[in-house]
């Protein structure tokens, strides 16, 4: 969310496109080309989310407590698609309220939302969550890979469970693929994103080993782990500050994935991090995070077009943040939470139907015994 607020600003938006040639202050340079970039990371935050999602979805199955697939798939797709489609409708409504127009000298990212189509057809096409949302809600690009991972989850689980002593080698293969594919891949370089989920899956299957390793880390050393993880996560921008055309930047996802896995490990194993993340306000934001993710872009874009992109960034960040959180909370209450209830009810109904079918197909206790069965 902070990422979108920042790049809706004209100057920051040009930095995002890496065509900003004007001199930068020391503070601006630090926020863009040092690990401080993590404060408004965009794609890097998506990588963290993918690792975390792989971990969370795989953990019940790694513990042999996962639901049946006939329950998992409908429930999962309902929880993803219903709020996402509702967010497209919400975004379309915002375009009816706030006119989008090209702003001369404005943010390239913001003007993209004025030049792209934003009609009912984009709601229809975007509802696939594969493409077609135009300028309505471009954040949905990352949900495409979440859907594909959910559909392919059995394959990820089989590969993770197979030959556990090779798990480190599996992780190395994933990272090598993430590094090499953007450099030599002939088909859709963004395909590496779906590979990132596998790191979270491997972490779920090795949770005990990760917890044991975390128990041996002294408290002060966690700061080093966090710092190193952030450096790895923001590697692309650190390199860009030195050499914009360095080919290593194309392999940034592989390096960032290591940092993302490190941050997830900190959340799992560091007591201080667990206390922080379980704080009431942080837990509340986590509860509405999906709704916030789905609605923040239309809110940020709408506010930017209302102001004509003239609000100074120091004021725009808190205003847009508060507005987006408020809208996200309302969306959670009206859309996401009811969709969760519907998904759970659907899953319970499917389990009940399966149990009834299994019971009806079981041999009756009063069945006529087979010849010779009396002796057993």
Give residue ranges: language-model regions.
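Membrane-proximal cytoplasmic C-terminal regulatory module of class A 7TM GPCRs
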Residues: 279, 337-374
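Alpha-helical membrane-protein architecture signal
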Residues: 34, 70-74, 136-137, 195, ...
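Membrane-interface helix-loop-helix regions
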Residues: 16-41, 80-147, 151, 256-267
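Transmembrane alpha-helical segments and their boundary/interface "anchor" motifs
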Residues: 41-46, 50-53, 57-100, 106-117, ...
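Aromatic-enriched alpha-helical transmembrane segments of multi-pass intramembrane proteins
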Residues: 3, 12, 27, 114-259, ...
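Structural signal for the C-terminal ends of transmembrane alpha-helices
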Residues: 58-65, 94-99, 156-165, 201-211, ...
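Alpha-helical transmembrane segments of multi-pass integral membrane proteins
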Residues: 35, 197, 225-338
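Functionally critical transmembrane alpha-helices in membrane proteins and complexes, commonly lining
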Residues: 1-62, 84, 289
């Amino acid at each position: 969310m902070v990422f979108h607020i920042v790049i809706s600003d004209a100057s920051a938006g040009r930095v995002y496109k890496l065509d900003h040639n004007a001199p930068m202050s020391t503070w601006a340079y630090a926020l863009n080309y040092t690990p401080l970039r993590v404060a408004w990371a965009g794609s890097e935050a998506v990588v963290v989310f993918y690792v975390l999602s792989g971990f969370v979805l795989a953990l019940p199955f790694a513990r042999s407590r996962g639901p049946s697939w006939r329950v998992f798939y409908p429930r999962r797709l309902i929880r993803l698609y219903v709020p996402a489609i509702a967010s497209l409708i919400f975004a379309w409504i915002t375009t009816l309220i706030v006119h989008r127009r090209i702003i001369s000298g404005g943010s390239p990212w913001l003007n993209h939302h004025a030049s792209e189509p934003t009609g009912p057809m984009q709601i229809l096409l975007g509802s696939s969550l594969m493409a077609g949302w135009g300028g309505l809600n471009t954040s949905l690009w990352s949900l495409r890979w979440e859907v594909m991972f959910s559909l392919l989850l059995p394959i990820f689980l089989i590969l993770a469970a197979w030959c556990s002593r090779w798990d480190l080698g599996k992780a190395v293969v994933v990272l090598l693929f993430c590094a090499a594919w953007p450099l030599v891949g002939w088909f859709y370089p963004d395909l590496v994103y779906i590979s990132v989920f596998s790191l979270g899956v491997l972490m779920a299957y090795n949770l005990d080993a990760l917890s044991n390793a975390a128990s041996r880390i002294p408290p002060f050393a966690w700061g080093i782990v966090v710092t190193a993880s952030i450096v790895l996560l923001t590697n692309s921008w650190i390199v860009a500050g030195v050499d914009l055309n360095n080919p290593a930047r194309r392999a940034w996802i592989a390096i960032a994935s290591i940092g993302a896995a490190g941050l997830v490990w900190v959340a799992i194993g560091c007591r201080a991090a667990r206390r922080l993340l379980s704080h009431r306000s942080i837990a509340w934001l986590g509860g509405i995070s999906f709704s916030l993710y789905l609605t923040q872009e239309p809110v940020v874009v709408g506010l930017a077009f209302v102001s004509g992109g003239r609000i100074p960034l120091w004021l725009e960040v808190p205003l847009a943040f508060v507005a987006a959180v408020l809208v996200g909370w309302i969306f959670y209450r009206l859309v996401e939470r009811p969709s969760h209830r519907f998904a759970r009810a659907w899953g319970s109904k499917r389990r009940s139907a399966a149990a009834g079918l299994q019971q009806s197909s079981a041999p009756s206790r009063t069945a006529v015994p087979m010849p010779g069965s009396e002796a057993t």
